[in-house]
Amino acid sequence: MAAPLAQLRDRFQAALAASFGPEWAATDPLLVPATNPKFGDYQSNVAMSLAKQLGQPPRAIAETLVQNLNLADLCEPPAIAGPGFINFTLQPSYLVAQLQQLQTDERLGIQPVSPPQRVIVDFSSPNIAKEMHVGHLRSTIIGDSIARVLEFQGHEVLRLNHVGDWGTQFGMLIAFLQEQYPQALSQPDALDISDLVAFYKQAKARFDEDPSFQETARQRVVDLQSGEATARQAWQLLCDQSRREFQKIYDRLDIQLEERGESFYNPYLPAIVEDLRRLGLLVEDQGAQCVFLEGFQNKEGQPLPLIVQKSDGGYNYATTDLAALRYRLGQDQAQRIIYVTDSGQANHFAQVFQVAQRAGWLPAAAQIEHVPFGLVQGEDGKKLKTRAGDTVRLRDLLDEAVDRARTDLTTRIAAEERSETPEFIEAVAQAVGLGAVKYADLSQNRNSNYIFSFDKMLALQGNTAPYLLYAYVRIQGIARKGGIDFAQLDPVAAVLTEPTERSLAKQVLQLGEVLDEVARDLLPNRLCSYLFELSQTFNQFYDRCPILNAEEPQRTSRLLLCDLTARTLKLGLSLLGISVLERM
């Protein structure tokens, strides 16, 4: 079942072809939801945009289009306003018919795409021997939500975790541990991940000031790269330990990922450099092999190259990213690749993509996209830090969110003189705390920095996860109070006599349009905005329309609207990685 906007767009494009010739059939009709209910449900200003090309007044163009629009089953007769705006109001009979289809459709009328794409979403990507911090939060949950939406649409999605599991830092850490704490390199879990981080800092300080230790560390890198057994075993232990810690976070956040770290691409790196050399793209600059690109300059205005092989013959992130991109397009047969990282890497990926383009590695139809995001800031507007000035550990942040949600809940239970089991309290605290953290991030435009505030994200009012969860809980409460099993309600024609009934019905039908936007523009905040507006509209409907005490057929019709709203909220929140609750 196509969403209203999609159906309207198809009819509009047919009218464009009928009005001005088949060459205009692919013209974007510029349809958007109406800014004010008095203008109907949707508006188009395509007549203004075509005036110059067609050499006609916008209003004349609008009149011609309206004459050729076949909308009798979908809309009231379109109205032309002002210089040539075309306003559309959906027919009540159309809304009723669409709602009836949704009642028995588990996917709420959203058909899988055809044909589906093979999509890779590269997200999270923490570094071995380092703890996940608040900076990993955004990549992890933005990437997960994008993957969930694309999967629901029917695309074949490969979720990749490009873990930082290779590099000279391992030689430094292994050398230090062999000297200071050798059992860490032979016994699993001899150290906690936080101990590893502390040892890494000590190793780095030692490396910076001790030339003999520098030499030892470099030798460990050579050992590791050559496959020497002791070095490889030590590296594997460090990776396994970090991986287990990462998985605890992923399990807690319900994140599915397939790890394919930097080391996976090591065998492919020499061919990257050789192929770029063969293609005549490499230039030697101060001993390093580089590709100079258009549009990239340093602060002094000099050309800024992408280095693909260092002067000592070693490789770097750019080499690995080029190898990964070529592997994903070749062996994985990806048609769309999405990289979810902080905005500070935007130039790096722009350079990598341009090199791949110049090398001829990008198929014409391939979509390669960098999805950047801004910083998480404290309430002082600066990068979020602990009081000691350290980076906030992700596990500590999640713990605090759950603790605060638990405190809020127990306070509310006491005020309401309710009695709840410890299991109930814990389940609600986990769902609300973790859901609040996810939603607070996803509800922001990812391109912006945002201020992290526990108080705001856990509030029961406003654009928050608790507000949306409470709307769902309120609907389940209606069912419990009335002894209603929504699944057993007989499908009936909705009765949309009240304005809030119509508004709610129309919003329920818009989920497919919103998901299309999210999949196209990779902006999960649009789904958040939709769910927030749906919750607001439901609460207005709840306040103004009796439900359990209404006469038939309004009673059943309103119960069905409640059920469709709850199902839409549940589905939408699941695509954000947030679980609903029956009570809270």
Swiss-Prot record:
It catalyses: tRNA(Arg) + L-arginine + ATP = L-arginyl-tRNA(Arg) + AMP + diphosphate. The lineage of its organism: Bacteria, Bacillati, Cyanobacteriota, Cyanophyceae, Synechococcales. GO terms for cellular component: cytoplasm. PANTHER family: ARGININE--TRNA LIGASE, CYTOPLASMIC (PTHR11956:SF5), ARGINYL-TRNA SYNTHETASE (PTHR11956). The keyword ATP-binding applies. This is Arginine--tRNA ligase. Keywords: Aminoacyl-tRNA synthetase, ATP-binding, Cytoplasm, Ligase, Nucleotide-binding, Protein biosynthesis. It comes from Synechococcus elongatus (strain ATCC 33912 / PCC 7942 / FACHB-805). It is found in: Cytoplasm. GO terms for molecular function: arginine-tRNA ligase activity; ATP binding. Monomer. Its EC number is 6.1.1.19. NCBIfam families: argS. It holds the Pfam family tRNA-synt_1d. HAMAP family: Arg_tRNA_synth. A motif ('HIGH' region) lies at residues 126-136. GO terms for biological process: arginyl-tRNA aminoacylation. The keyword Ligase applies. Belongs to the class-I aminoacyl-tRNA synthetase family.
